[in-house]
Amino acid sequence: MNVEEANKIVIRPYITEKTFALVENEQKICFLVNRESSKPRIIEAIKILYNENAIQIETARTVYGKKAFVKFDSADKARDLATKIGML
């Protein structure tokens, strides 16, 4: 997978008050992703785009699209990535 394919999978971070709290409390960041994307492909895209390893992923389909809740192994990594992508 290259960067172009990864950008088609991970559309953008999903920022709300609830997802903002997830960064601090559960080391998770929420992304809107392509509806047809699988969990392994989402993890691979996160690694390519942001150079971070995800340890767990949960997905949910909503009227806004498919959301991926990506958990990182430490609060520092989640917080640093959130700052890097403009959430904090």
Short names for language-model regions:
Residues 1-88:
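Contiguous, often N-terminal, cationic amphipathic patches that form binding interfaces
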